Amino acid sequence: ATLLSKREIEILVHLAMGKNNAAIANDLNLSVHTISNHRKNMLSSSRCSTTAELVRIATIENLI
């Protein structure tokens, strides 16, 4: 079972494409603050130190 919500995985896919919070917020019609919160929550729940590490682990686990 994944620790990430569907929305978090959706955001993670955008992060893996190299998009920043503002671009993701624009694409998903959300606020930059919301994207930032999701990103922080993903890092916290996954115990990853960086977004790059989070993307790497998600790729290995076939989440994205």
Functional labels for PLM-detected ranges:
Residues 57-64:
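Intrinsically disordered, low-complexity basic tails/linkers immediately adjacent to helix-turn-helix/homeobox/MYB/SANT
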Residues 12-17, 28, 57:
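Short alpha-helical segment immediately N-terminal to, or the first helix within
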Residues 1-14:
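Regulatory hinge/linker segments at domain boundaries
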Residues 14, 46-47, 63:
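Enrichment for repetitive, rod-forming helical segments
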Residues 20-53:
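Recognition helix of helix-turn-helix DNA-binding domains
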